């Protein structure tokens, strides 16, 4: 199956969603994938280093406007695309119900939670989701929020963010012990690691509060 990803968030533009998408798409068969996105600094060099096809628009941002609809449809026909994947579902995914090709959406968190709680945008998001042939979510939370906004069960595939195992590998026992000692931790001390931006919606404050409640137990 050949499919087209339409997104505003793709490397070399930096960010969590960009990294999530790239880690997915770089692992797919290169001859089955086309990515449509906007230009970002350094894109020429980046695109040359990738195995899969990347098409850059002349416009600086993708919006559900007639020019983008035309370009998506042209790529669908020229590349024999079977499925169009949109990220985010709103606003880019609003093209899905307007075009004849089957489509799906990719959901992470805030881009479904925020419009899903505002009456006007919730109805738009709900329509996009209900008409999707596939909904890819990064976890159970995104799935629940999507189905709440849609008001029904959805054809969901949960694909959590992965880890580049070639870049990030467990330390050997000796280095691990030395690193723990550097931070005043013994070999059997419990360690909870979270990696995130410190913004309210990500709930790091809740983790800190929970850790304080456990200080006498650990």
Model-derived segments and their meaning:
Residues 39, 141, 162:
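Carbohydrate-associated surface elements
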Residues 14, 165, 199-204, 217:
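A short, basic/aromatic alpha-helical/loop segment that forms part
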Residues 86-92:
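Short His-centered aromatic/hydrophobic patch
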């Amino acid at each position: 199956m050949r499919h087209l990803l339409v997104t505003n968030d793709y490397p070399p533009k930096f960010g969590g969603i960009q990294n999530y998408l790239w880690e997915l798409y770089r692992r797919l068969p290169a001859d089955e994938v086309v990515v449509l996105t906007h230009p970002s600094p350094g894109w020429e060099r980046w695109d040359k280093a990738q195995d899969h096809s990347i098409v850059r628009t002349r416009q600086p941002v993708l919006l559900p406007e007639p020019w983008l609809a035309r370009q998506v449809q042209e790529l669908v026909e020229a590349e024999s695309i079977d499925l169009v994947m949109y990220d985010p579902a709103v606003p880019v995914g609003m093209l899905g119900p307007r075009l004849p090709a089957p489509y799906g959406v990719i959901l992470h968190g805030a881009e479904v939670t925020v419009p899903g709680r505002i009456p006007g945008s919730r109805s738009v998001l709900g329509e996009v989701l209900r008409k999707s042939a596939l909904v890819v979510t990064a976890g159970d939370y995104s799935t629940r929020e999507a189905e709440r906004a849609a008001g029904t069960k959805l054809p969901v595939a949960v694909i959590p963010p992965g880890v580049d195992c070639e870049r990030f590998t467990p330390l050997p026992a000796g280095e691990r012990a030395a690193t723990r000692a550097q931070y005043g931790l013994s070999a059997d001390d419990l360690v909870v690691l979270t990696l995130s931006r410190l913004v309210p919606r990500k709930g790091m404050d809740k983790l800190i509060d929970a850790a304080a409640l456990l200080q006498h137990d650990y």
